[in-house]
Amino acid sequence: MAKEYSTISRIYGPLMIVEGVKGVAYGEVVEIETEWGEKRKGQVLDARENLAIVQVFEGTRDLDIKTTRVRFTGETLKVPVSMDMLGRIFNGIGKPIDGGPEIIPEDRRDVHGAPLNPVARAYPRDFIQTGISAIDGMNTLVRGQKLPIFSGSGLPHNKLAAQIARQAKVLGEEESFAVVFAAMGITYEEANFFKKSFEETGAIERAVLFLNLADDPAIERIITPRMALTVAEYLAFDYDMHVLVILTDMTNYCEALREISAAREEVPGRRGYPGYMYTDLATIYERAGRVRGKKGSITQMPILTMPDDDITHPIPDLTGYITEGQIVLSRDLHRRGIYPPIDVLPSLSRLMKDGIGKGRTREDHPQLAQQLYAAYAEGRSLRDLVAVVGEEALSETDKKYLEFADRFEREFVAQGYDEDRSIEETLDLGWELLAILPETELKRVKKEMIMKYHPKYRGRSS
């Protein structure tokens, strides 16, 4: 039952303290009305004996302690869901901003989702093609996985996110694939880039966009990824769709978490972030996966910018504990004009082995990826040696490794923003590059694979 109070004792930042309340619960939705009739929404952050701390989504600017009324609805925050959300753009709290009509909901779902019994989870399997060789070939994305992208300020992670959202597909099941894209704390320029990218390429038809701008209240950023994941769960488990959820930028999310924690005067943890940030991030990342008996799946690609390119910073550090690998963008590759600047050596997809190989991508994929990785690592190591002793000191084989490393970056890692490579094109390109090396150096690939896929022998009858 709804209860109304006008006993606000304090307003600071996005928070207000309401005293003399009874029967108020954590997470309860609050309706706030000013003396001139303006209505805002909020949520209970903390409920104690006779007071409640409320976070106001639209901010507390111009709210008067004496005349503002607060109504506790007794309900949790819910998002209206419908298949009509595909092709639409919303703000951070689910209101349409594309000029289209309001969504007529088929249902209303709690933004925090329902706890998923670990026993009910199915193991992530099957390949998702992003059309980007450095990911598909070397750090494969698997259906149901959570694979973050670790970027840095000024690197083209937004461009990469838009390309993945446009190109990603489940092979043979394109009609059941959708993208839910949530951007947090982005500028108007970035928001316009995403809108334009989705609309001009037609990717908007199979996508749902949530855009939280930098000048929107910080508290809204806490809700945005949960809104997106609630819609993703609806599409995946009610309509058996394979949903890719892209969240950018999780660093902005964590900054909002720190800002609200400071406003609540909580004891800070590492670098001022709240001590519960690991648990909070887990409530987002752990909503990826597959459920036994359900055809649909949720795959997550959170994107975060590492402050000062520091991979040990609390945000990437804690993210790495929860997720299943990472795609690392390199400032050095970016400076040399290579897009996407994915550094395959520190990058890792822990579930890659379960989504590739015969019947999923191609039988040679696991061995080819290992050989490419080993050869590129050797080439990178020799680059450092050349800087000390010069190229004249290298053997002919060493020079081949140097050539391989250079061409691997220019031809395999680098590709156009509009270039969508199939997995077959990616793997064949890998073999073309391995042909630079003597066959005796291909120690991680079985002889029968060399005879079948190496350019020297390809096309010959067995």
Curated annotation (Swiss-Prot):
One of the record's GO cellular component terms: proton-transporting two-sector ATPase complex, catalytic domain
InterPro entries: ATP-synt_VA_C, ATPase_a/bsu_AS, ATPase_A1-cplx_bsu, ATPase_F1/V1/A1_a/bsu_N, ATPase_F1/V1/A1_a/bsu_nucl-bd, P-loop_NTPase, V-ATPase_su_B/beta
Domain of life: Archaea
Pfam families in the record: ATP-synt_ab, ATP-synt_ab_N, ATP-synt_VA_C
Keywords: ATP synthesis, Cell membrane, Hydrogen ion transport, Ion transport, Membrane, Transport
Topology of the protein relative to the lipid bilayer: Peripheral membrane protein
Assembly with partners or alone: Has multiple subunits with at least A(3), B(3), C, D, E, F, H, I and proteolipid K(x).
NCBIfam families xref list: ATP_syn_B_arch, PRK04196.1
Protein name: A-type ATP synthase subunit B
Gene: atpB
